[in-house]
From Swiss-Prot:
It comes from Aspergillus niger (strain ATCC MYA-4892 / CBS 513.88 / FGSC A1513). GO terms for biological process: (+)-kotanin biosynthetic process; methylation. This is O-methyltransferase kntB. It is an enzyme of class 2 (transferase). Pathway: Secondary metabolite biosynthesis. Its EC number is 2.1.1.-. S-adenosyl-L-methionine binds at residues 255-256, 280, 302-303, 319. The gene is ktnB. The active site is at 322 (proton acceptor).
Amino acid sequence: MTYPEEIDEYSLIQNGLKSLNEAAQRCQQTKHSSQDSSIEGCSARQSARDELVLEALKFLQIAQGPIDAAATCYERTAHLASVRALLEMGVFEALPTGRVSRRTEELARELNVDESLLARLLRNSSLYGPFEETGPGQYRHTPFSEAYLRPEIRGMFRFAMDDHMPAHLKLHEFLQRNGWQEPSSTTDNPYTYAHKTNGKSMFDNLSEKPERMKAFNNGMTVQAMTPLWMIDLFPWRSLAQLKPTAGQVLAVDIGGGKGKAISRIRSFCNGLPGRYILQDQEHVVKSVEGSLDPSIERMAYNFFTEQPIRGAVTYLIRRCLHNWPQDSVVCILQNIAAAMEPGKSRLLIEEIVVPAEKAGVEEGWMDMIMMSLGAKQRTLKEWEMVLGLAGLEVKKVYQIPGNCHGLIEAWLK
């Protein structure tokens, strides 16, 4: 462990274990006391689990001690490399589900790979998962390895390893080369530096690599699986006070993807007259043809251009702005602001709002990913700043205590 002599390492371990047990008890209590499917109930359960995970990570570090904790960089990277190799090798599919074991010699013959290589990779991928060693040279699936059989989880992992990991490993080189300045370009950032994209953004680079783009798209569907929709916090039924007409646009979902958010909004406004519009790039809009309620209009739109829908009651942009540097964000917001009607239109932004202090694990790693792309997750102060540059001001922030995601309501100044 190698703690300084004046520190009682076992007292630290006992205190850490106490904190971990208390977090586990809170997690269990929250699970039993908050069974409802509301956003508040889901958020309470997620926050309790996040706290438990953070306390577990802290306890692991205490148990390891300063030197061993630093040395786990070898362990973590080796474990990730082993799992990535086994994924490409086809081992995840070759092992049967249902907790049935197979021997390495059988797998090696079936996959036409070197048995010694396979055994070494499986050995390192079974110490604490995702696989389980059940006997000499015998391995089987666990729920943690079976998760990788899902296309969205597989895509997320592949994209993290093949695209983001190289950017993280080259982060220090890029920052040093650029005088330790915050990355703020979509075409000159740690990602483009690591992948040598020759002036192309990540998205332009991926468009030339179909398999990588497929992994990215599959991985992004994980985000859509969240039960935490911050738009649920907005009082949609209060729009009835405006006495909307059938021809009035109640909501425009900008960059709305498959239309899940605008469909959700329409259900909240059920019975209110008005139009609902989904906007996204042309190929995205075409992909949802036939899958949306006919009452929801579809419109091809690039949010870096003039907003064609003017005077809508509500404009929504959800989980898009964190992908862009400040200048781009201000441009997007200015296009929306120019279409808004004073005293009538509001803009809703669903994004992470990074706490001013003691940020959590999610907002931490998410911001590092955004940094590699020249973008960022923002604090409320930073959101107020970019909105101000676009002629907007924050009226209200809808947020659940302990949750980093929020819904920012902004109006014209």
